[in-house]
Amino acid sequence: MNRRDFLKGIASSSFVVLGGSSVLTPLNALAKAGINEDEWLTTGSHFGAFKMKRKNGVIAEVKPFDLDKYPTDMINGIRGMVYNPSRVRYPMVRLDFLLKGHKSNTHQRGDFRFVRVTWDKALTLFKHSLDEVQTQYGPSGLHAGQTGWRATGQLHSSTSHMQRAVGMHGNYVKKIGDYSTGAGQTILPYVLGSTEVYAQGTSWPLILEHSDTIVLWSNDPYKNLQVGWNAETHESFAYLAQLKEKVKQGKIRVISIDPVVTKTQAYLGCEQLYVNPQTDVTLMLAIAHEMISKKLYDDKFIQGYSLGFEEFVPYVMGTKDGVAKTPEWAAPICGVEAHVIRDLAKTLVKGRTQFMMGWCIQRQQHGEQPYWMAAVLATMIGQIGLPGGGISYGHHYSSIGVPSSGAAAPGAFPRNLDENQKPLFDSSDFKGASSTIPVARWIDAILEPGKTIDANGSKVVYPDIKMMIFSGNNPWNHHQDRNRMKQAFHKLECVVTVDVNWTATCRFSDIVLPACTTYERNDIDVYGAYANRGILAMQKMVEPLFDSLSDFEIFTRFAAVLGKEKEYTRNMGEMEWLETLYNECKAANAGKFEMPDFATFWKQGYVHFGDGEVWTRHADFRNDPEINPLGTPSGLIEIFSRKIDQFGYDDCKGHPTWMEKTERSHGGPGSDKHPIWLQSCHPDKRLHSQMCESREYRETYAVNGREPVYISPVDAKARGIKDGDIVRVFNDRGQLLAGAVVSDNFPKGIVRIHEGAWYGPVGKDGSTEGGAEVGALCSYGDPNTLTLDIGTSKLAQACSAYTCLVEFEKYQGKVPKVSSFDGPIEVEI
């Protein structure tokens, strides 16, 4: 694999001058800004760093950044993120909310009828709504804690701006955790002493040098490493290319344990071990049983570095519950034959073994268990802390495993109030409710205010939420069960959303404020989150389209409405803030890394920190566990957690446990009615819902104008479905349309629809207005129309999107127009 291979498919469109459209920047805007159209400017995104050039006043050419040797073809969709019909052009207010305010008919929310207003009007309505909620309900009535992937950039962080500005008005309900790793980041501190999921992992060079076996467990790094939290470097692909060669030469054995054939498995040409969805824990327990019964485990490591093995063994061997977790017990559940399980156990202890866990495996009911059990297996093997051995929970994310430069990164715009600042409504009275709730339980809170739940050893009392604020995140993408969300939104008095595009979250809002894209403002960011290769100047390409504003400008204006503009900005503008953040970073790196003055940096577009040193995760702990203990209560790896055991939870006990799911395919509960497991993993052609709006790029993968649904040949034949057919996928929670792709990569009983597909509900008559109805058909193919909205367990209370069964059929009715991408029905009054 080389750079040329990665550039195929990019070259044909990235270097071609593109024509204009009705949403293009006027020529005089560029002239007024003094922008040189012959100059290549540098910027970055979650999809990587790149350069842009303008022609006739618009973004015309996009090419990869010089240092990105493995750019993703997603940069072909960048221009469509700026120029597309989904852009929020002006401040807009839902029709009935404009007429009646907090007494509006909330059942009309989602009918997509909006009225254009001025910025002054919109921000005044925003403040008035906050005043009303704080006066009537106090801070428990407002939830502004939901966050998402936002856009890259340290200054224009939508989360920071929203929370700082709203915090100047008053307090509000916050969240804990996230949707990506909610179960993992909660359970692993009890087991390994840190969240692990966002921790730097053992360096790829050490893995390639020392590993004999790599187990990719529900992990697809080749797909997921295309994007990153900051501007991605894509250096991991160089290591994947080396790994591919070592697999070919027989020097490293890679086993992909997954219900489907992943892009990584196909790229590496490695072994595939199919496992039935949601049954990984049974396979892991059977491996443990084999290791115990054949004495294959490292007893010395267990005794010296872990706690609780003695409590765990009786469960595995069946002396505790009468069920021995043998390979024969696991085989009919997980679908892996007993002799294969035994061979796998021998392989794992034969040489140096590195587990690489994916995140999707913990986004299911009891999602804490596979992460905990995987850590137990790694402990039994005894190689935690050795180069090329042990366990990782993040080698598919943001260049984890690429040696870090170790340089200080630039700070960000502050999300909290400055010292001695107080909000206008300075109340901390949450009326007996909790001020923080698990991130994935906010719909529960709206529907059941006052209810008490267990969460991570504490009691959480749901607040009575009346108003929501979203900025730079799209919960109508990442939360589960659209129709349940509609029912909850009927109870809200006001919803405010700040976004670039008319996402479904905007559609179900009352006040919508137009933010500009990353490419219409200046910013700075780290180049590579974990590699930390340098600092990138994110230079404005064009002026903001229509009446959109940067996040900084939107909330500066809002702060002015509050009478707190100078407090908010610290009396600095955009470029002053960028220079301040840069200079603070320069001071932190003094004597370690050379950084030019800000003007030179901005002209160059980039500061390079250089390569980093290789590193082994948990090596210090292994070398001396007394001096370098883990962050667990005992300082050791906790196979059995006394703390969790004391919680007394029936769905997360003191050691890893197999528990049946509410619904499970391949003979599990609910499979008689809905026999198909829906896999709604991260997409390969966008970041969550970001870039779905890019029309020309979307058309390169859409099927018959819909999101693809990947189907096994067996299931397709049984239902008379062929490639390109429009398919209705459904269960008792909802229904959607998608375009069929029949593929041998998917075994019987499994379909895949990538999350991030824009929700586009239509009524029974196919109308956009009818999309407000509970039960409406999603016209484009959002899988979270169908997913189950329950917590993983009483411990994490995280999302369980992967616990989802469906059925599907060839769609026979009149095919409705997709309602996801064309924006609202604009009403004049």
From Swiss-Prot:
It is found in: Periplasm. Predicted to be exported by the Tat system. The position of the signal peptide cleavage has been experimentally proven. InterPro entries: Asp_de-COase-like_dom_sf, CT_DMSOR/BSOR/TMAOR, Molybdopterin_N, MoPterin_dinucl-bd_dom, Mopterin_OxRdtase, Mopterin_OxRdtase_prok_CS, Prok_Mopterin_Oxidored, TAT_signal. Transmembrane segments: none annotated. One of its GO terms (cellular component) is outer membrane-bounded periplasmic space. It catalyses: trimethylamine + 2 Fe(III)-[cytochrome c] + H2O = trimethylamine N-oxide + 2 Fe(II)-[cytochrome c] + 3 H(+). Mo-bis(molybdopterin guanine dinucleotide) binds at residue 180. It is an enzyme of class 1 (oxidoreductase). Its EC number is 1.7.2.3. Reduces trimethylamine-N-oxide (TMAO) into trimethylamine; an anaerobic reaction coupled to energy-yielding reactions. Although torA is induced by both TMAO and DMSO, only TMAO is used as a natural substrate. PANTHER family: TRIMETHYLAMINE-N-OXIDE REDUCTASE, TRIMETHYLAMINE-N-OXIDE REDUCTASE 1. Belongs to the prokaryotic molybdopterin-containing oxidoreductase family. This is Trimethylamine-N-oxide reductase. It comes from Shewanella massilia. The gene is torA.
